[in-house]
């Protein structure tokens, strides 16, 4: 079997991740030997794993594991470890506000604990975080270094660009943080953030201290050290200032971390505008009776299915995702409505649900990005599911997005062996409302044609009409 270095693991000289036999391993180089030993001997590694803040790992002993039989001799190698696998992977350009905030707070929690053990984080990127049962978990064991009390936090600017600034822009500008990462995948610079934030944000001390002050200092060709160091004395912030390294004490580092924690934990998403689907089931023509009838059919369809992971398309608030979760099934719940996904994330976090809520438009899912388009795989290349559920969605795709039924049937068949789908006909009030403002060019959108086209790719397992409506639910198995 071939060993492949992971395409996103090439920047850090401390080591790299590689794949062998569908498993992930991490090589630790000799340049990181002292830090890795300190991480373990100080007790920090044990504490991080105990708190479920860092993935656990197994050290691979030479001669006792077949992996060493396939590795070439490497004079740089110190150790090989096999980290715990977190799947599926997600990235910040797919996260909701509270997901990004929790990932940022995890960094600061880890920093505070690391300082107690004589270490710090040498970088602060959201790509080092994944989510498990609604909670963030750090995945890079090599991000820790020995703390030097005379040196400011080297990752301060990176932390602000990747966590604080996107959150501030969503709070003050209604510019969703996942959209910020789509434009700035490595974090948004301070000068851009300062230009985008409204005037009123200047009266917020956290914004002034972490955004407008460093932006002004960066803009100035010859800033005076006192312009930064005197103002930051109270809060202990650092990063791009002219403050002397010798003056940056452990107390100032703690002040910085605590102040960032206070600022970020106080931020809330801008909820002034209601999400399009906030009241989908309660205040629309779709009644609670419809929802209950649909739930009964759904429960019957999934009762005997052997499935471990489900992709819920157009998940909204995750009502049906939660029903799956109750059966011990892992769910990837996606929707392009950010407030809905954020509410689902909060619930998943509060109840530790095995649901990964992501902001994704299935008609334009996250593409592969990074160097050679290989560092971060596209969404559709990261998911592996047994069942796709697409409830009250097909009319939005066919009529709203002009996607032919043939393309949808083929698409669904490529990504799962089972499909649970709800057909919403033209005489449904929702579809009538959609067609009221546009020409009906969708001659092929009929129940008969839907069944005919989907039968090319799937075998029908079950089919049932939803009482009180003209909608029909289908359970299909891939041919």
PLM features: what roles do these ranges have?
Residues 306-316:
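Conserved class I S-adenosyl-L-methionine
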Residues 396-412:
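A short, conserved alpha-helix within the catalytic core of class I
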Residues 345-382:
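S-adenosyl-L-methionine
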Residues 317-329:
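Conserved SAM-binding loop of SAM-dependent methyltransferases across substrates and taxa
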Residues 330-335:
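Conserved SAM-binding motif I beta-strand of class I
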Residues 389:
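A conserved beta-strand element that flanks and buttresses the S-adenosyl-L-methionine
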């Amino acid at each position: 079997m071939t060993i492949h270095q992971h395409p996103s693991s090439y920047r850090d000289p401390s080591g790299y991740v590689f794949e062998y036999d569908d498993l992930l391993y991490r090589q630790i180089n000799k340049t990181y030997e002292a830090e890795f030993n300190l991480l373990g001997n100080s007790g920090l590694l044990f504490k991080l794993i105990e708190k479920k803040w860092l993935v656990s790992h197994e050290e691979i002993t030479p001669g006792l594991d077949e992996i060493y039989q396939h590795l070439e001799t490497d004079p740089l190698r110190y150790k090989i470890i096999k980290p715990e696998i977190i799947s599926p992977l997600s990235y910040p350009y797919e996260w909701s506000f509270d997901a990004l905030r929790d990932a940022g707070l995890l960094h600061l929690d880890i920093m505070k604990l690391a300082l107690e053990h004589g270490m710090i984080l040498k970088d602060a990127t959201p790509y080092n975080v994944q989510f498990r049962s609604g909670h963030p978990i750090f995945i890079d064991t090599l991000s820790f270094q020995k703390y030097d009390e005379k040196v400011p936090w080297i990752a301060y600017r990176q932390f602000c660009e990747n966590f604080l600034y996107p959150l501030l822009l969503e709070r003050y500008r209604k510019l969703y943080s996942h959209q910020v990462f789509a434009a700035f995948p490595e974090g948004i610079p301070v000068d851009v953030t300062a230009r985008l934030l409204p005037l009123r944000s200047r009266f917020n001390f956290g914004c002034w201290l972490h955004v407008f002050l460093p932006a002004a200092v960066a803009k100035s060709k010859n800033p005076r050290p006192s312009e930064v160091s005197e103002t930051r004395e109270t809060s202990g912030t650092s990063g791009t200032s002219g403050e002397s390294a010798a003056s940056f004490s452990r107390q100032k580092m703690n002040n910085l971390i605590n102040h960032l924690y206070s600022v970020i934990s106080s931020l809330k998403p801008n909820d002034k505008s209601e999400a399009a689907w906030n009241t989908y089931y309660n205040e629309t023509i779709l009644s609670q009776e419809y929802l209950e009838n649909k739930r009964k059919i759904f429960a019957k369809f999934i009762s005997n299915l052997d499935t471990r992971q489900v992709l819920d398309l157009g998940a909204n608030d995750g009502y049906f995702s939660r029903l799956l979760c109750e059966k011990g099934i892992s769910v990837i719940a996606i929707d392009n409505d950010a407030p809905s996904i954020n509410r689902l994330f909060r619930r998943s976090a509060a109840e530790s649900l095995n649901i990964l809520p992501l902001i994704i438009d299935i008609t334009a899912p996250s593409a592969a990005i990074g160097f050679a388009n290989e560092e971060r795989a596209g969404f559709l290349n990261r998911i592996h599911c047994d069942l796709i559920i697409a409830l009250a969605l097909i009319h939005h795709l066919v009529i709203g997005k002009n996607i032919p039924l043939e393309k949808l049937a083929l698409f669904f068949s490529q990504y799962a062996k089972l499909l649970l789908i709800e057909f919403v006909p033209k005489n449904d009030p929702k579809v009538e409302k959609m067609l009221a403002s546009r020409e009906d060019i969708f001659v092929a959108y009929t129940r008969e044609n839907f069944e005919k086209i989907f039968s090319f790719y799937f075998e029908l397992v079950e089919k049932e009409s939803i009482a009180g409506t003209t909608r029909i639910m289908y359970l299909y198995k891939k041919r």
